[in-house]
From Swiss-Prot:
Pfam families: FtsX
Domain of life according to the entry: Bacteria
Record field: compositional bias (Gly residues): 1583-1594
Chain segments carrying region Disordered: 103-129, 220-306, 492-513, 658-698, 1233-1253, 1572-1598
Stated name of the protein: Uncharacterized ABC transporter permease MG468 homolog
Higher taxonomy: Bacteria, Bacillati, Mycoplasmatota, Mycoplasmoidales, Mycoplasmoidaceae
Family: Belongs to the ABC-4 integral membrane protein family.
Length: 1882
């Protein structure tokens, strides 16, 4: 046995190469199979485990519903009953709001009052001695409504609230001589239903659930009646009041007038002013006086208590003086909210008494009324809506009682939506027509100016009197500015006086409406070919019809909102009540505020039944919201108690609500302009409040307020020891109320809870505000600060805390995907320490600072929202986070996957309004099968949802991995992981099979060779009695070495190279894979398997060997056999030499080994070809594209219209600067000293409506103060919008206010204190801006301000505090007190930036780098810097290769480039320039790129056809009844460029402009202005033209002004609609947000409603001039359609004049103009110039896809080069050497008979070289076919064209490698042959 083992080890030396070869082969097999199979198993196991762990669903139903479209049937009826205005004692319309005192709030001095309490007096509490708390609350409430400064010891009583008794339905009265407008409310506009319930306030045809009021501080006499005898009391009761209740109603500019002491005598009341006509009392019968405790009440001289008022005190008391000017500081607008039928809302309303008066003291008159009855046509509802509406009706009471304060009166709400009746008093209707004749007739179609006089002159009565001024226009009279105290006549008195005068006058020509006549006209409206009669009945009917339309629209919106609100609840209760499901919410949000990622896939992981979130690292999701310690402010800051989690607490209470901007616009009241700062504040506030009132549901109010009260009740109140016991009891009550529910209380308890709630809320915040404003969604918190939109100075709470913040810090936590975390070098928050999440939750008040201080590696942001990284997680439904069907390959560099809770998810939607949401219902088939055994779960779900979802029946429900539903991205995200698993499994099986066969073959070869080599020795040993078993045992040494070495190193390398193997699929697999340890199972398993197989093969080999006798085996030991082919070659017929025959036979004698060697060599060469060719193809595609395209982005813009004119251009760093040569006219005038003095005088009179800025003070300078020049001229910020009172007025009066203006948010987004209120100019401007634009501006504005403050120079300049940073929110904004001029309340023109800040501002914008960082909104100016940007013109429309077969949905566009373009270098494959082929402006040539040629098999000489659709005349053509057919244009393909990304077609830019009608005649250019004919605004001498000049003939006797369009054609300017940019972050995408006006009117309006009609009133001809076509061909056809003769012979100017005259007559009123414009332009008025949906589509998406593919190819390339190729080459060497060992005897024999060693070496090469050549040919053929497949695959997936041209360079590398292999084999052979002894050959 020992000798046998010795022979074994002796043989190992001879078989070293073969042994090494088999060890290496087995090592490679184990390494590859362990890596791939382990990876494949990991994929399957982790995916399966994740499905189980997260309870993942496998069936989805897209939550897509048909948009609700309720229909109302309307009928006009006659009604005898009418609820009129509120009935007021003695026609008094003033109220005092007594404090709605709670159980713990009352004025202790009230106990001593001798005044008898009435039912309306304040309620008394049980702790009247707690004055301190009550005073705090009282002061807070008063301060919220405008008190500038309140002394502790002064006594206050209440708030004066006023209605003005006018006949104005619009809420506006206007006086023609001074254009004073004052927002008011009319008691007559209160609307009641047929049962007499108050519905709301009627204004502009809408019922608002808020009543606009005027309010001010009302004060009682200091002694409150103490010591007064009855006589005195009686005498005083007869006094005509001169109090705040009157003065609060005066406009700002009117001086507060008081009675001087000299005008009074002892024991006498102040003398009456002659203008005072009425005694004003409050609803509790108390007189209202001004009174300060500092004044002497009743002196020894016997003077009255008011006689000692010092006039000097009025102006010397600093802020205290403001207390004597309530009209300045207390006359603020408020909105009285109404919630019909809601007792709770009434109880919690501070204005309860007023509401009760409105409700109880209304008048019911038996007068004729017009009744508009609206009935919901349920038969017209969709199947879903009808069933849901019926369900809501049945479940209304259950829903109301079960939703806490949800929809407290849902049943009543539904009934009012089913049937609604609006009664309109005929007197009311008449009064409206009488008071607003001009306005009404302007709004009615078909009425000309001449009709206005005709209609009223033909009626009964005096026509002349019918034209008298609106009585309400006399309400606000002004006196000259004077500091002399005197008493002015009150507005209300004037109104009443004028009304009485009017009632006593003769009929003014407006006859009473007769129901039958009006009904007849009403029924005719809308009928075909109806021509309105020019009479009053038709006016009445038209007015009623307008109201009908408005109310119908309003009711439809309310029904739609109700149905959408309860949709999920209905489906859960009805269609899906037997099924378990969860709502799946995903959103794709584009991020612009950070460079971390461009887009995020945001998943809402809040309490889902299915598809939970699995946490890999970090905080476990289930304990995400947990706290270890109890905190007094837990609920204030959204923490978690022991029993309830935050998610349950917020359920829906804190969900942000997104206001419908269209509703706001519809409900917006007319904003009047005044010359008063207070009125400016009032107008903006009233408009906002009124508009939002219509959009809020009752449920929102109930959701927020009680929850907020509960939160406040659980808060740790300051100075607890000083808080009354009753307050503590109230807190306890609210702490338990949430558990018991409001409904569990009796009526007394409800009232008590409501009152305590009001007082509690008032304790913390003085302003009882609108519920929706409580939620600051883009800051993730409920913020209850002291300062609000109309607030004043902060009220200091006992703890000096300026505000109370209710936050949800959990919403600032996010879980991210593992790939995104690694890609961006982020980390998960540590579990302990200052940066731990636990620290953030335990100290929530410091959360903003904590987030700000958090290192960047622990956080990220989306549009300004900051999120801390709590952990790494995953979920099945986002397993492959594809974001778009256009970009199916996720790119973790630019795209991220995050998981948020409900609040975080909603906040992202708010911060990214353009985010696209995907909502699904998720089901699990196993759960469905359990309830519906034997049925297909998908069909079960589909049958339940049929008729409800707005999708095809086949899409009602489907398997989540059904890739045929690829339009639903959720299928792609779920299908692709399976696809990767399957591909990897297939690859692993194929590789395993191939390698296993190869390994088995080599093992057999090794064993057979070993046995054959030692056959003689083994035969002798066998003859000595050795058994086969002992031979097998001896071979175990051989097997053990092979098994141990190959297994150990194979598993070890698999462990070490795990990350590299995973990297191959890392771009396609996003579910985290566990990190593997050394795989001992694989090690022992593979070692045992190899050992057993080795031994088994050895057993078979020895069995076969010893089947022959031993003597035979010994004799055969030295026998050398030649194949039969060698014997055949011995025939004489073959003339080959013996050596030649030997060499041929050598090749074919071992066919199996030949095939093996050729196969391995072919694979090796093929892999070399792939590794060297495919990456080179990608590199060539990229380099060719870069060579042709010298830009990173191509940005398509909206084609400018004829009406808008060409885009103006300017480098972004110069935005805001005036440049007349470019058509950018200054907003401000360069006023001389004399003019400036006149301006100042006008400002003092309050009549200046111009910007107060002078261009001289807006000249920019460098840091040294030196003026900066451009083209030799000093640069001015003449186009940067700066805040001013004149600018605010122009906003509502200038129809071209925004033309070529630039707006920087930071310069207008700050609170300006005006008249006791804070107004924010940005809030006014943003109403005319699309919401997504405002969000983008907000997201990037802070970055610029941070850059300014981090610059040392500007930070030092800011020492005076221009910019302030809020330490709590880190928000930076301007400080109005530091940047504005001293506001003179009598001089509105004084509101402007002061000189010091303007210097700071001009230096900031004088720094090019800083100026470039600022984010600006601009109107009609596109950033084009020739250094980094270039323009182009693209043409799109139906496209095809045959004129008769055009595809209207074709994705192809023609890109028109300049022949001298520096950004597009068109070259062919030979490097030759192709641009000259499209340099001609007349030849219709096109150059296509390689991608287009490949996709369409296009050849040079082919033709393409297109019908341009994005023309500049696309809206102009809509003026025509029969628009001309767009001609089809033919282009000839003249060249193919080598750029390989996407599919491109290039033409000459001038030709493109001609096709789009952007050039060609004088009527086009950059529109500088629209001016009166004969007038020019060209002050600079720049090139301008009046090609658009026109006349405006009028059909009326009054000649209207004629206007012309002033064009500028800048030198070298070429029209365009696209921009190439070299920037990686183009300013046009990230900084410059460009809006363009399709209509050519640049005013503050977003639709053609009231804003538009008010803005253009009196300017109709100018507007018509702007919006009419300018194209000659269109004008000719339009003139012919209008019946004009001689059109063909007219000049262009005359032709346009005629057309304008026609439209001036046709659109004679603002209403007809608005209607006509709406029919042409629709809602496309002010639109973003950049087509956001296609921004960079051909660059960014393709670049992302290419990057993923390139990286994957490189990973595969590295894997091939590093593992498989070396393995194959070593295997080939081993095989060669093994074959050499077998043939060694033959060659020694040949040597012995005289053949040289060189001849024998050549004989050996005759085997290897043909084998290599054959391998080379096979691999080349396979690679050629593979290249074609890869080319098609890559182009289909990523739109990247790869050439399939064969590259021989990689094969040269292969030839060298094989040469080295042959050299190694040959060297080994040569050495062996030279050292061999001849006896070895025998």
């Amino acid at each position: 046995m020992f000798s046998f083992f010795k022979q074994i080890f002796k043989s190992l030396k001879k078989f070293f190469f073969l042994l090494f070869g088999i060890i290496f082969v087995l090592f490679s097999i184990i390494f590859l199979e362990t890596s791939i199979l382990q990876l494949s198993n990991n994929l399957v196991n982790t995916y399966t485990a994740l499905v189980q762990k997260t309870n993942s669903s496998d069936i989805v139903a897209p939550a897509i519903f048909k948009e609700s479209s309720p229909v109302y049937k309307t009928e006009l009826k006659e009604e005898k009953r009418h609820f009129s205005k509120i009935k007021l004692t003695e026609k008094k319309i003033n109220f005092i709001w007594p404090y709605q005192e709670s159980d713990f709030g009352s004025d202790s001095e009230k106990k001593d009052s001798t005044t008898k309490s009435s039912d309306n007096n304040p309620r008394k509490g049980d702790v009247n001695d707690k004055d301190k708390l009550f005073l705090a609350r009282k002061r807070g409430i008063l301060k919220a409504y405008g008190e500038a400064n309140i002394a502790e010891k002064r006594i206050y009583k209440g708030l004066a609230v006023s209605f003005q008794n006018t006949y104005s339905f619009t809420g506006t009265d206007q006086e023609s001589n001074n254009l004073n407008q004052n927002t008011v409310s009319d008691p007559q506009n209160l609307i009641y239903d047929k049962e007499g319930n108050l519905l709301g306030y009627f204004v502009d045809g809408l019922i608002l659930d808020g009543i606009p009021l005027r309010a001010g501080i009302a004060r009682f006499p200091g002694d409150k009646g103490k010591g007064e005898d009855k006589k005195t009391t009686k005498k005083k009761s007869e006094i005509k009041q001169a109090s705040s209740a009157t003065t609060v109603l005066q406009p700002l500019a009117a001086q507060a007038k008081m009675t001087d002491a000299k005008e009074t005598t002892n024991n006498e009341e102040p003398k009456k002013d002659s203008n005072v006509e009425e005694q004003y009392t409050t609803n509790n019968k108390d007189k209202v006086w001004f009174k300060s405790d500092e004044t002497q009440a009743g002196s020894s001289s016997g003077e009255s208590e008011t006689s000692k008022l010092s006039t000097s005190y009025l102006f010397t008391g600093g802020q205290e003086a403001a207390n004597w000017f309530p009209n300045l500081y207390a006359n603020v607008p408020i909105v009285l909210p109404i919630s019909p039928g809601s007792q709770f809302w009434l109880e919690t309303n501070p204005f309860k008494e007023i509401i009760e008066v409105f409700q109880k003291e209304k008048e019911e008159k038996e007068k004729q009324s017009f009744s508009l009855t609206f009935t919901l046509d349920t038969s017209k509802l969709s199947h879903l809506d009808k069933e849901e509406f019926d369900w809501l009706e049945k479940q209304a009471e259950t829903i109301s009682s079960g939703s806490s304060f949800g929809d407290y009166n849902l049943k009543k709400k539904i009934n009012s939506l089913k049937s609604f009746e609006l009664n309109i008093n005929k007197d009311w209707l008449k009064n409206k027509v009488k008071a607003e004749k001009e306005t009404i007739l302007d709004s009615l179609p078909g009425f000309s100016n001449s009709d206005k006089n005709t209609i009223f002159s033909t009626q009964s009565g005096d026509a002349k009197s019918g034209t008298q001024s609106n009585p309400s226009s006399l309400i606000a009279l002004r006196s000259s500015v004077s500091f002399k105290p005197q008493l002015q006549q009150t507005n209300v008195a004037l109104a009443q006086q004028q009304q009485d005068k009017q009632e006593s006058s003769a009929d003014d020509g407006v006859k009473d409406p007769t129901f039958s006549d009006v009904q007849t006209e009403f029924d005719k409206i809308g009928t075909e070919n109806h021509t309105p009669q020019k009479n009053l009945n038709n006016v009445y009917a038209a007015l009623l019809h307008q109201w009908k339309s408005i109310f119908q629209e309003d009711l439809v919106k309310k029904v739609t909102a109700l149905l959408e609100k309860y949709r999920d609840a209905f489906l859960k209760a009805k269609a899906l009540k037997e099924l378990e499901f969860s709502r799946q919410n995903l959103a794709i949000a584009t991020n612009v505020s950070s460079e971390e990622s461009a887009s995020f896939l945001v998943s809402n992981k809040d309490s889902q039944k299915y598809n939970d979130l699995s946490i890999i690292e970090g905080i476990n999701f289930k304990s995400w919201l947990a706290k270890e310690k109890s905190n007094p402010l837990d609920m204030v800051y959204g923490g978690k108690s022991n029993s309830e989690g935050f998610l349950e607490k917020v359920e829906y209470e804190f969900k942000p609500t997104q206001t419908d901007e269209k509703k706001k616009a519809a409900a917006k009241t007319t904003q009047g302009t005044t010359d008063s700062l207070t009125q400016l504040a009032d107008a903006s506030s009233s408009s906002s409040s009124s508009s939002t009132g219509d959009t809020k549901s009752t449920s929102t109010k109930f959701q927020i307020y009680p929850k907020l009260a509960n939160i406040l009740a659980q808060a740790q109140l300051p100075e607890a020891s000083s808080i009354p016991d009753t307050l503590t009891n109230a807190i306890k009550q609210w702490s338990t109320l949430d558990k018991k529910g409001f409904e569990a209380l009796d009526d007394t308890g409800k009232s008590k809870a409501a009152n305590n709630y009001v007082a509690l809320l008032s304790y913390f915040t003085p302003e009882f505000q609108d519920p929706n404003e409580l939620v600051v969604t883009n800051r993730q918190k409920l913020d209850i600060p002291i300062i609000f939109k109309n607030g004043v100075n902060p009220l200091t709470l006992p703890t000096d805390q300026q505000s109370l913040v209710v936050q949800t810090p959990e919403a600032h936590g996010a879980v991210v995907s593992q790939q995104w975390l690694f890609k961006h070098d982020k980390e998960v928050l540590p579990l302990e320490g200052e940066y731990s999440w636990k620290e953030a939750l335990e100290n929530p008040k410091n959360l903003p600072n904590w987030l700000n201080d958090l290192p960047d590696k622990y956080k990220f942001s989306i549009n300004g929202l900051t999120f801390a990284i709590l952990g790494v997680g995953e979920s099945v439904e986002t397993g492959y986070p594809v974001l778009s069907t256009n970009s199916p390959l996720p790119n973790s560099q630019d795209e991220g996957l995050i998981f948020l809770n409900e609040q975080g998810y909603r906040s992202v939607l708010f911060a990214v309004p353009a985010a696209s949401e995907e909502n699904y219902y998720a089901f699990k088939s196993d759960d469905i099968k359990a309830k519906f055994p034997g049925q297909d779960p998908i069909q079960v779900v589909a049958s339940k949802l049929k008729g409800y979802l707005n999708v095809p029946d086949s899409d009602l429900a489907f398997n989540v991995k059904d890739i045929s539903k690829f339009q639903y991205l959720t299928t792609a995200r779920n299908y692709f992981p399976d696809l990767v698993q399957n591909y990897l499994a297939i690859a692993s099986v194929v590789i395993a099979a191939f390698l296993s066969i190869l390994a088995l073959y080599l093992t057999i070869l090794l064993i057979k060779s070993f046995i054959k080599k030692n056959q003689t020795e083994f035969s002798i040993i066998r003859a000595g009695g050795f058994s086969t078993a002992k031979f097998i045992a001896g071979m175990s040494v051989f097997a053990g070495i092979v098994a141990l070495a190959s297994s150990f190193f194979g598993v070890l390398f698999a462990f070490l190279l795990e990350r590299q193997v995973k990297g191959i699929i890392s771009r396609y697999w996003f579910i985290a894979l566990p990190a593997n340890s050394f795989n001992w199972i694989s090690f022992f398993g593979s070692m045992l398997l190899i050992f057993v197989i080795f031994q088994f093969i050895s057993w078979i080999a020895f069995k076969q060997l010893f089947s022959k006798p031993v003597n035979v085996l010994i004799d055969q030991g030295n026998e050398t056999k030649f194949s039969v082919f060698l014997h055949l070659l011995k025939r004489k017929s073959y003339t080959m030499t013996p050596l030649g025959k030997f060499r041929v036979s050598l090749i074919i004698s071992r066919l199996s080994r030949l095939f093996t060697y050729v196969g391995l060599s072919s694979i090796a060469l093929l892999l070399i070809g792939i590794a060297g060719t495919i990456p080179q193809k990608f590199g060539a595609a990229q380099s060719n594209t870069v060579l042709n395209r010298n830009f990173n982005y191509r940005l398509n813009l909206q084609t400018p219209t004829e009406q808008s004119g060409w885009y103006a251009i300017q480098p972004y760093s110069r935005f805001g600067q005036t440049d007349d040569s470019l058509g950018i006219k200054a907003l401000y005038k360069d006023k001389g000293d004399q003019i400036q003095q006149q301006q100042q005088q006008q400002q003092q009179q309050g009549n200046d409506k111009e910007h107060p800025y002078n261009l001289k003070e807006l000249k920019i300078s460098d840091r040294g103060g030196n003026p900066i020049k451009h083209n030799g001229k000093e640069i001015e910020l003449g186009n940067l919008l700066l805040p001013s009172f004149g600018g605010a007025q122009q906003l509502n009066t200038d129809e071209n206010f925004f033309r070529h203006a630039s707006l920087s948010k930071w310069l207008i987004d700050f609170p300006i204190r005006v008249g006791g209120a804070n107004i924010n100019p940005w809030e006014i401007v943003e109403k005319s801006i699309p919401k997504q634009i405002t969000q983008l501006l907000s997201a990037s504005s802070d970055q610029f301000l941070i850059a300014v403050l981090t610059d040392d120079y500007f930070n030092n300049l800011n020492n005076n505090g221009f910019l302030t940073r809020n330490p709590r929110t880190n928000f930076i904004q301007l400080d109005a007190a530091r940047v504005l001029t001293q506001i003179n309340v009598f001089n509105p023109g004084g509101v402007k930036f002061n000189e010091q800040f303007l210097k700071f501002l001009t230096k900031v914008y004088g720094d090019p780098e800083l100026s470039y960082q600022d984010s600006k909104l601009t109107y009609g100016i596109v950033p084009v810097d020739p250094q980094i940007e270039e323009t182009y013109t693209y043409v799109q429309g139906p496209f095809g290769f045959k004129e008769t077969e055009l595809n209207p949905d074709s994705p192809y566009t023609l890109t028109g480039i300049s022949p001298d373009s520096k950004f597009v270098n068109l070259t062919d494959s030979g490097g030759n320039s192709l641009r000259s082929l499209i340099s001609s402006d007349s030849e219709m040539n096109v150059i296509v790129n390689a991608g287009f040629q490949y996709a369409n098999n296009t050849k040079i000489g082919d033709f393409i056809f297109i019908q341009p659709k994005n023309t500049a005349t696309r809206y102009s053509e809509k003026f025509l009844k029969s628009p001309p057919k767009t001609p089809t244009v033919k282009f000839r393909v003249v060249g193919v460029s080598t750029d390989a990304f996407g599919q491109e077609l290039y033409i000459n830019q001038n030709i493109a402009n001609r096709l789009l009608k952007l050039n060609g005649f004088d009527g086009r250019g950059v529109i500088k202005d629209v001016v009166k004919d004969g007038q020019s605004t060209d002050d600079s001498g720049g090139t301008s033209s009046g090609g658009g000049s026109c006349g405006g003939g009028s059909t009326s006797s009054t000649t209207k002004d004629k206007y012309k369009i002033e064009y500028v054609k800048p030198t070298g300017y070429v029209p365009f609609n696209g921009v190439f940019s070299k920037e990686l972050n183009p300013s046009l995408v990230s900084k410059a947000l460009v809006l363009n006006s399709n209509i050519g009117v640049w005013g503050n309006f977003t639709d053609f409603g009231n804003n538009f009609t008010n803005l253009v009133k009196g300017k109709e001809n100018k507007i018509i001039t702007s919006i009419l076509p300018s194209d000659p061909d269109i004008l000719k056809q339009l003139a012919k359609e209008k019946g004009e003769n001689g059109v063909d012979s007219m000049t262009y100017e005359n032709l346009r004049k005629k057309v304008i005259e026609k439209y001036t007559s046709e659109w004679s009123s603002t209403q007809s103009l608005a209607s006509g414009a709406r029919g042409i332009f629709g809602d496309n008025i002010m639109v973003p110039a950049l087509k956001l949906d296609a921004a960079g589509a051909s660059a960014q998406i393709i670049r992302n896809n290419a990057e993923v593919l390139f990286n994957t190819v490189n990973q595969v390339d590295g894997f091939l080069l590093g593992t498989i190729i070396p393995f194959i080459f070593i295997t080939c060497v081993v095989l060669g050497i093994s074959m050499l060992e077998e043939m060694k005897r033959i060659f020694i024999s040949l040597k012995s008979i005289g053949y040289k060693d060189s001849q024998n070496l050549v004989s050996l090469l005759c085997f290897f070289i043909p084998a290599f050549v054959l391998s080379l040919l096979i691999s080349i053929a396979i690679l050629a076919g593979l290249l074609v497949g890869v080319q098609a695959l890559v182009f289909g997936v990523a739109q990247v064209f790869l050439t399939n041209v064969f590259e021989f360079l990689p094969y040269m590398v292969g030839i060298v490698l094989f040469g080295a292999t042959i050299f190694v084999i040959g060297s080994y052979f040569w050495i062996k042959l030279r050292s061999a002894e001849l006896k070895e050959g025998f």
